[in-house]
């Protein structure tokens, strides 16, 4: 029970990143740079307190992983700009779970028993149904929907999902480091990635500075993710953390004024239920 409580913290902190950053404002590149600065400050503080042993391998893979992460985060910020937070974030979380699970099954053979394939396939089906309903648009809301560019949003989500899943595979399946050890090299890679996406034209303005708060949310989520994994297992902790999409949906509607018709609200609730059940089933399969 304690582990599940810890897992709820990254659910809220990571789920809040999208609407908090969009409430602050700025371009996706400014949002990413500000977030990575905050993450770097948080990581430096953790390093000064913990003083973990640092190896060359840890630095190299940590920086590489952070750079790959920045691809995922920049794409997600672009997707939120094109589609809205309440649509983009659940699609992003769900697509990460689906693609990550498929890679785990096909490449790393994480499912070995028949029951795992049955329950896992049901979980993936529920996530796909959740995709459909969370992004489904009502024709009656066309005046609002025309302000969004869903084709660009889906393209941004595609490379965002690839970046996030590559990052997850690197640290969960290929190289396994302690989070408290790798968090600083990873933050350095995140900053380098953000600077690259700005074409090395760094401009520290109010949006970059304010978005550093979002980096603190990321860091707090990482610490509690570590605690949750130690108490309840990584599979359960990760699956629960991905339910932050629910926080994104609610935050986008309440704090960013993203409008939904009654029909769209019913679809959103259906999508949320599918996400919750699908994510929990995936956690059960992996554990």
Curated annotation (Swiss-Prot):
GO cellular component: plasma membrane
Membrane protein topology class: Multi-pass membrane protein
GO molecular function: carbohydrate transmembrane transporter activity
Keywords, ordered alphabetically: Cell membrane, Membrane, Sugar transport, Transmembrane, Transmembrane helix, Transport
Source organism superkingdom: Bacteria
Main location: membrane
Subcellular location field: Cell membrane
Transmembrane segments: 1-21, 30-50, 52-72, 88-108, 114-134, 157-177, 180-200, 213-233, 236-256, 267-287
KW Transmembrane helix (keyword) present: yes
The keyword Secreted is annotated on this UniProt entry: no
Entry's family note: Belongs to the GRP transporter (TC 2.A.7.5) family.
Protein name: Putative sugar uptake protein SPy_2205/M5005_Spy1856
UniProt organism field: Streptococcus pyogenes serotype M1
Lineage of producing organism: Bacteria, Bacillati, Bacillota, Bacilli, Lactobacillales
């Amino acid at each position: 029970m304690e582990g599940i409580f810890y897992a709820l913290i990254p659910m809220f902190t990571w789920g809040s990143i999208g609407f908090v950053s969009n409430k602050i404002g700025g371009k996706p590149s400014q949002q990413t740079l500000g977030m990575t600065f905050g993450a770097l400050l948080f990581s430096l503080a953790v390093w000064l307190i913990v003083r973990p042993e640092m190896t060359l391998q840890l630095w190299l893979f940590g920086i590489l992983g952070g750079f790959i992460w920045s691809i995922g985060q920049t794409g997600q910020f672009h997707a939120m700009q094109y589609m809205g937070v309440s649509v983009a974030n659940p699609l992003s979380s769900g697509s990460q779970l689906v693609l990550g699970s498929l890679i785990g099954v096909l490449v790393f053979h994480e499912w070995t028993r028949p029951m795992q394939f049955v329950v896992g396939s049901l979980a993936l089906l529920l996530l796909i149904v959740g995709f459909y309903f969370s992004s489904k648009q009502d024709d009656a809301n066309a005046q609002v929907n025309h302000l969004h560019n869903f084709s660009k949003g889906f393209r941004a989500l595609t490379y965002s999902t690839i970046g996030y899943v590559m990052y997850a595979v690197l640290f969960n399946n290929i190289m396994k480091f302690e989070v408290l050890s790798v968090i600083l090299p990873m933050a350095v890679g995140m900053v380098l990635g953000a600077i690259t996406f700005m074409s090395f034209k760094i401009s520290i303005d109010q949006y970059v500075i304010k978005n550093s708060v979002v980096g603190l949310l990321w860091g707090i989520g990482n610490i509690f993710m570590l605690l949750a994994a130690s108490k309840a297992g990584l599979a359960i902790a990760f699956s629960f953390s991905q339910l932050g999409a629910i926080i994104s949906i609610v935050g986008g509607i309440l704090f960013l004024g993203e409008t939904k018709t009654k029909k769209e609200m019913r679809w959103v609730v259906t999508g949320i239920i599918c996400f919750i059940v699908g994510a929990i089933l995936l956690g059960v399969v992996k554990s």
